Regions:
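Basic/polar, cationic surfaces and motifs that engage anionic cell-wall
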Residues: 68-157, 194
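Solvent-exposed beta-strand motifs enriched in subsets of small alpha/beta binding domains
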Residues: 151-194
Length: 194
């Protein structure tokens, strides 16, 4: 569950194992049971997620996210996070004009290790096959979603898509988050009361 670390994998620590680490996002179950993506870094910031290898570091070249493995054998949970991850990658490929099927665009941690740009870690190669999936089927799913989502470019320059970073019942908490978001460079951020 996002915000909870019952599996002792230590992402929720300041410096797990003495290392400073941070992925760009987590995908997992919320307290209400739904699956969501929780962004922890702006997409254009360098993360500290994959380590390095003999040919450099995936941290310098890739956006990363961690899929919380709440239930390695729970098919419903797997399908929900797999779908969420595919939708996230679809959005990122669209945003950055990337071909999900191009070599090295979407890789698992273990594939980064094989390329010499990441530490030796199995994700998601140990989990996807348990549910009949692979990184190849994942990339194909992203390509399918990307093709389905392609729509004619709007000529209306005033159409905006907004991204919400939180919902708070205490105004002081909303003010604190707004301050953090603006400090991170998002100067047009604002609070909307509803």
């Amino acid at each position: 569950m996002l915000g909870k670390n019952q599996y002792n994998n230590h992402w929720n620590q300041d410096k797990p194992g003495g290392r400073q680490v941070c992925v760009h996002a987590f995908i997992g179950k919320l307290a209400n049971g739904t699956v969501a993506t929780y962004q922890t870094l702006p997409w254009n910031h360098r993360g500290w997620h994959g380590g390095s290898g003999s040919k450099g570091s995936v941290n310098d070249t890739h956006i990363s996210f961690e899929i919380c493995e709440d239930g390695l054998t729970d098919a419903a949970y797997f399908n929900a996070v797999y779908k969420e991850a595919a939708e996230l990658c679809t959005c990122l490929c669209k945003e950055y004009k990337l071909d999900p099927m191009a070599d090295g665009v979407i890789i698992g941690h273990y594939e980064g290790h094989k390329r010499g740009i990441a530490s030796n870690h199995a994700d998601p190669g140990h989990w996807f096959p348990k549910h009949g999936k692979s990184m190849d089927t994942f990339r194909a799913e992203v390509e399918k979603l990307l093709s389905a989502n392609e729509a004619p470019t709007s000529t209306d320059p005033k159409k905006l898509y907004r991204v919400q970073v939180g919902a708070y019942s205490v105004k002081a908490n909303a003010d604190a988050m707004l301050k953090k978001v603006k400090a991170a460079g998002f100067k047009d951020a604002f609070i909307k009361y509803s």
